[in-house]
Amino acid sequence: MSDPRLPAAFLQPGSSSFSDFLAVQAPDLLPGRRAVPQGHAGDLAPHGTTIVAATFPGGVVMAGDRRATMGNIIAQRDIEKVFPADEFSAVGIAGSAGLAVEMVRLFQTELEHYEKIEGSTLSMDGKANRLAALIRSNLGMAMQGLAVVPLFAGFDLASNQGRIFSYDVTGGRYEETAFHSVGSGSLFARGSLKKLYRDDLTAEQTVQAVVEALYDAADDDSATGGPDVTRRIFPVVQVMTADGGRRMPDADVATIADRVIAGRMTSPDGPTAPLTARPLEGA
C-alpha cells in the first residue's frame, strides 16, 4: 500500500545513486545546479585549511586542524573538517567550508542510499569515484573561487589495507601512496611527513606523525590552526581499520598533542630525521 505522504517517485525502484535521483526529482537541491552571481566570491566564505592522511599496517589515519579563515580573519577556531563517510572510510574537507560540508552530507547519503538499494556497500574505488562526480558537479562554483577539494581515505576490505585518494577541482581522482595532505598548509605538512613517516608505524605512532605534521603546517601557514592548549581545541582524528572507522576520543588526541608540544619546547622545529654518515671514498 502506497504512502499518501510521499510522491510516487519515492516509492518506485530506481537508480542506486541518490544524486541521480535528486537530479530528476529536485535538481535545485544539488550544489552544482544553483545559479551563482558573476564574479569572484572566494573571500566571502569561510575556508577550511589543512587535512592530513597516512597509512599504517592494518589501516589509515586522517586528521584535520580546527581553523577556518575568511581572508585574513579567523572565522572559526573549532570547526570540524574530518567526517566519517561510512563504516570504513572518512572524508576531510579543504576549501569553501559551507559547500564542503554540504558535499560531505550528500556523499554520506549517496553511500547509504546505495547500500539500501543494492544490499551491499560500494567498493573503495566506487566510493572514490562517486566523490569525484560530486566534486565535478561543483566546477562552476570552483571557477568563481568557491572550490571544494576533499581528501578521502578508508580501509579497503578487498585489498585489506588503508588507501588514500586526493582530488582536483575538476573531479580528477588520484590514489596516493603512504601519506598525503590537502589545503593551504599541505606543502608544509607533506614536507614534515617525508621526514617522519615509516611504513612500520603503529596506529598511535601514525596519529602522532600526523599531529606533528599539522603542527608544522600551523607553524608556517597562518590559515592552519595548531593545537590550542588554552581553549583545549585539538585536531579531529579518524582511524580506519578492518574493524571499522572510529573518531579518536578528544582526550586521547589531547594527550598526543600535549606530547608533541612538550617536545617542541626543547626542539621547536620538531623531530629530526636520522642520518647515517658514510666515509667519502679516498678520505
UniProtKB/Swiss-Prot annotation:
GO function terms (MF aspect): threonine-type endopeptidase activity
UniProt key word Protease: yes
Activity control mechanisms: The formation of the proteasomal ATPase ARC-20S proteasome complex, likely via the docking of the C-termini of ARC into the intersubunit pockets in the alpha-rings, may trigger opening of the gate for substrate entry. Interconversion between the open-gate and close-gate conformations leads to a dynamic regulation of the 20S proteasome proteolysis activity.
Organism the protein comes from: Nocardioides sp. (strain ATCC BAA-499 / JS614)
Active-site residues, record numbering mapped to chain: T49 (nucleophile)
Keyword entries, A-Z: Autocatalytic cleavage, Cytoplasm, Hydrolase, Protease, Proteasome, Threonine protease, Zymogen
Protein name in UniProt: Proteasome subunit beta
Entry annotated with the keyword Protease: yes
Purpose: Component of the proteasome core, a large protease complex with broad specificity involved in protein degradation.
CDD domains associated with the record: proteasome_protease_HslV
Primary localization: cytoplasm
Top-level class of the enzyme under EC nomenclature: hydrolase
Gene for this chain: prcB
GO BP, one annotated term: modification-dependent protein catabolic process
Subcellular location(s) of the protein: Cytoplasm
The family this protein is said to belong to: Belongs to the peptidase T1B family.
